[in-house]
């Protein structure tokens, strides 16, 4: 791992409390999932000792995080905080960019808009944005659906990060080429057009506020990046762990969320709907067309799915 100047780690392990025979033939009940209140700062915790983890490994972990210029690091088990560490002046209230890990927020918001009947991800983007949102020939532009934007398979030129019609030229038919690119941002325009309101307003109402998150979108000329404190990132991680459900409300349709965290196309099996997937036979990375054999993170669980952004902004 590179010695990055900015590093935010959030780990939400996808495991439940272990069950063991207690000697009398009875198996302890599995621990329930915990959802922190959407207001205030209270949040249930668990101790390292209660989980039976190796407590002597904690200080070396903290030393490693400090060495790597980490800003914050959290471990949650079933929604409860096990570790919450801040470094280099960073605090629980410090706002920090998610970078591309925030793409998964766009995925969730798009899924909500679909479940409300406002859009269909298999419909041409041009249906919502009109003709000319790219410089591709009309028949090629019309091939691009929101699903292609979710899966990085638009076939549009990825050479320039600035998403303008002039830069969105035709390279390949939609669905035939995987390439990591900022064109996913057009999903925000699709949601805005379909809902009749600003994307951030729709996002705040349908997702952010329901989870008790803080934060805002910084819509720069090139990048559209979400900023929040680490606990807000953790809240979204809990939603992701529960396949789009928060307490009793299915905020994001479960079928859509399940699609999001499974292979979305055959070109890069390690990619879902803007989510990265472990345990696949091969993977591709941003910035190239090389196909690498093996799993994305060999020492991680094969069923892990992750929101991943530059400078190691992560939800695992």
PLM features: residue spans?
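Sec-dependent signal peptide recognition
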Residues: 2-10
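N-terminal leader/targeting segments and the immediately adjacent pre-domain N-terminus
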Residues: 15-91, 96, 114-119, 151, ...
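Second-shell loop/turn segments in exported
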Residues: 47-49, 92-97, 134-137, 171-177, ...
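Non-transmembrane alpha-helical segments in soluble domains
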Residues: 62, 111, 126, 147-151, ...
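Structural recognition of the beta-strand scaffold that forms the well-ordered cores
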Residues: 72-76, 81-84, 99, 148-151, ...
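Active-site SXXK
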Residues: 79, 96-122, 149, 186-191, ...
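Active-site helix/loop module of the DD-peptidase/beta-lactamase fold
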Residues: 116-154, 195-229
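Penicillin-binding protein/beta-lactamase superfamily catalytic region
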Residues: 212-314
């Amino acid at each position: 791992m590179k010695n990055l100047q900015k590093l935010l780690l959030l780990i939400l392990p996808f495991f439940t409390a272990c069950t063991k025979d207690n000697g009398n033939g009875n198996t302890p009940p599995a621990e329930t999932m915990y959802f922190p209140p959407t207001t205030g700062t209270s949040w249930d915790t668990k101790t390292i000792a209660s989980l039976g983890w190796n407590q002597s490994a904690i200080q070396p972990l903290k030393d490693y995080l400090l060495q790597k210029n980490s800003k914050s690091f959290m471990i949650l088990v079933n929604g409860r905080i096990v570790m919450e560490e801040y470094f280099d002046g960073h605090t629980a209230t410090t706002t920090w960019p998610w970078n591309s890990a925030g793409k998964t927020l766009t995925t969730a918001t798009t899924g909500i808009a679909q479940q409300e009947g406002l859009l269909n991800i298999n419909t041409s983007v041009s249906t919502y944005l009109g003709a000319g949102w790219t410089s591709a020939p009309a028949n090629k532009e019309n091939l691009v659906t929101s699903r292609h934007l979710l899966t990085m398979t638009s076939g549009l030129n990825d050479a320039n990060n600035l998403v303008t019609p002039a830069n969105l030229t035709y390279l390949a038919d939609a669905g035939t080429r995987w390439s990591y690119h900022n064109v996913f941002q057009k999903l925000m325009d699709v949601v805005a057009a379909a809902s009749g309101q600003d994307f951030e307003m729709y996002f705040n109402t349908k997702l952010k506020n329901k989870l008790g998150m803080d934060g805002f979108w910084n819509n720069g000329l090139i990048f559209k990046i979400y900023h929040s404190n680490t606990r807000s990132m953790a809240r979204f991680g809990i939603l992701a762990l529960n396949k789009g459900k928060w307490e009793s409300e299915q905020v994001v349709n479960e079928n859509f969320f399940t699609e999001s965290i499974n292979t979305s196309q055959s070109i890069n099996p390690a990619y879902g709907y803007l989510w990265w997937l472990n345990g696949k036979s091969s993977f591709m990375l941003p910035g190239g067309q090389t196909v690498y054999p093996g799993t994305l993170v060999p020492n991680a669980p094969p069923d892990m799915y992750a929101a991943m952004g530059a400078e190691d902004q992560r939800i695992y």
